[in-house]
A protein has these predicted regions:
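RNA-binding accessory domains that recognize and position tRNA/RNA substrates
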Residues: 1-204, 208-209, 223, 336, ...
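Hydrophobic beta-strand scaffold residues
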Residues: 106-107, 194, 243, 261, ...
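Active-site glycine-centered loops adjacent to acidic/histidine catalytic or metal-binding residues
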Residues: 112, 247, 290, 332
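Cysteine-nucleophile active-site neighborhood
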Residues: 213, 218-285, 293, 338-353
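Catalytic beta-strand/loop cores that center a nucleophilic Ser/Cys/Thr
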Residues: 282-323, 357
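A glycine-centered loop/beta-turn motif at secondary-structure junctions
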Residues: 318-356
């Protein structure tokens, strides 16, 4: 069956329908990872977005549920150049097309994803529609595309109940704004007992549990939409408990302490982004997935100073908080998919908790 990807600038790509045949409107973004498509699909940070994979062949090793970063896929839609319909992998349990159908997610194959990516890089991230309706009306569709917003998506992806990953070491409170499983697993593998809390949990509840450390997770959407959460993060900042924040959590901490964030032209999404440690000068290759960034010009150096920056575009990739046991990063040290270069940051967090005892 034919499918169409329609961008808000009027560009139309024709391809073949994969997954569900329902019609969706979403923010179109691109990911440059060559592998790890299942981890991308199950990353809650993609809620409210349709993902274009720039690598030309997707699906060749199938679906291995053990590798999922959450229980289900989160993107509104999926865009690929060529879909491998016969995966070759002894671990494979399903195909991408079946996986998308199961969760009612529409996709389109046969799209010139390099051309699409060039458009998004030149004009910036834009909204789009995936449809199987060949009689589409651009005059009717384009105003709808321009009016679309992702809105408050954290509440859609956070856990509904508190749950615990047992451990014999430090006790960490993880606020789930759309956390990838490997954040909690990275702590648990280091012996930590990790208690995962819903995003709307009050700071008082977190602090009453007397954790050794607090982790603020990744998540989807515009951080400025999380007004209630930002107020609670401010209370956590004022405590003396060590805090480590990743991605959206990094942005929320910045907003909670008086800095500002801004939307990027097309964001960073992939497993090959170089970041520089500004203290040592060392460069690490990182996994990233964000469309917003902390505006370093709005930082108060008495509160926080840049700790990492992106080598390519010099945007902020991390902050160190003055006089506090708090550090935050924009990238993903848990990787999955991506390199493990910055996994040492979890060890730094453990050391911080140990010293704070």
């Amino acid at each position: 069956m034919k499918a169409f990807l329609i961008l808000e600038d009027g560009t139309v790509f024709e391809g073949t329908s994969i997954g569900s045949t329902k019609e969706i409107i979403s923010e179109i973004v691109f990911n440059t990872s060559m592998t790890g498509y299942l981890e991308v699909l199950t990353d809650p940070s993609y809620a409210g977005q349709a993902v274009c994979m720039t690598y030309p062949l997707i699906g060749n090793y199938g679906i291995c549920h053990e590798d999922q970063e959450s229980l289900k896929p989160w993107p509104d839609g999926y865009i690929v150049r060529e879909l491998s319909r016969i995966p070759s992998n002894f671990r494979s349990e399903d195909t991408i097309q079946n996986f998308l159908k199961k969760y009612d997610i529409p996709g389109i194959a046969g799209v010139d994803t390099r051309a699409l990516t060039r458009i998004l890089r030149k004009k910036g991230t834009m909204n789009g529609m995936i449809t199987t309706n060949a009689a589409y009306n651009l005059e009717e569709i384009l105003p709808r595309l321009k009016a679309y917003t992702t809105g408050k998506v954290v509440e859609k992806v956070t856990c509904t109940e508190t749950h615990v990953l047992e451990g014999n070491g430090k006790r960490v409170a993880l606020l789930d704004f759309g956390a990838k499983d490997n954040i909690a697993q990275s702590l648990n593998r280091r012996g930590c007992e990790v208690t995962v809390y819903p995003a709307a949990t009050s700071a008082e509840t977190i602090l009453a549990s007397d954790p050794d450390g607090i982790m603020l997770s990744n998540g989807p959407g515009d951080p400025k939409e999380c007004t209630a959460i930002i107020k609670e993060v401010r209370k956590l900042y004022e405590s003396e408990i060590p805090i480590f924040a990743i991605c959206l959590g990094h942005q929320l901490m910045a907003l909670a302490t008086g800095a500002d964030t801004k939307k990027m032209k097309y964001g960073h999404r992939g497993g090959n982004h170089p970041v520089k440690d500004l203290e040592t000068g060392r460069v690490y290759i990182s996994s990233q997935n964000h469309g917003y960034v902390v505006d370093t010009e709005t930082l108060n150096p008495e509160v926080a100073v840049p700790a990492f920056e992106n080598v390519n575009d010099k945007t902020n990739e991390g902050l160190k908080y003055t006089g506090k046991n708090i550090f935050t990063v924009q990238f993903h040290p848990e990787a999955c998919p991506g390199p493990q270069d910055s996994g040492y940051l979890f060890d730094r967090f453990l050391e911080m908790m140990e010293v704070n005892q």
